[in-house]
Amino acid sequence: RLTYDEIQSKAEGINKNSPPDFQKTKLMTRDGIDYAAVTVQLPGGERVPFLFTIKGGSTGYDNAVALPAGGRSKPETGEIIGVFESLQPSDTDLGAKTPK
């Protein structure tokens, strides 16, 4: 089963000096596990695409399990507000790349 929910995500402005903007995006739900497509910035500044979840599965559960309870949320939108940190033992993509 695959469903999509429309959400808004904060995106950088068109140029460096413009304010950030919210863009419509979709949250993909596959078999009851929600994934949000995000961009992760690595320590060197490189940005890579990443699928993030806080519901379990292969990404983020062991690191983010306590964050939803400690964070704030907007009940009218269901949005979780906070800074999410995750320690990855490899470079990116859940071990698909060798650490630098």
Swiss-Prot record:
Region of interest called Disordered, as start-end residue ranges on this chain: 1-23
Listed GO MF terms: oxygen evolving activity
Database matches in Gene3D superfamilies: Photosystem II, cytochrome c-550 precursor
Superkingdom as given in the UniProt entry: Eukaryota
Compartment annotation: Plastid, Chloroplast thylakoid membrane
Biological processes, Gene Ontology terms: photosystem II assembly; photosystem II stabilization
Annotated GO CC locations: chloroplast thylakoid membrane; photosystem II oxygen evolving complex
A Pfam family annotated for this UniProt entry: MSP
Keyword annotations of the record: Chloroplast, Manganese, Membrane, Photosynthesis, Photosystem II, Plastid, Thylakoid
InterPro entries associated with the record: OMP/PagP_b-brl (IPR011250), PsbO (IPR002628)
Family of this protein: Belongs to the PsbO family.
PANTHER family: OXYGEN-EVOLVING ENHANCER PROTEIN 1-2, CHLOROPLASTIC
Protein function: Stabilizes the manganese cluster which is the primary site of water splitting.
UniProt name for this protein: Oxygen-evolving enhancer protein 1, chloroplastic
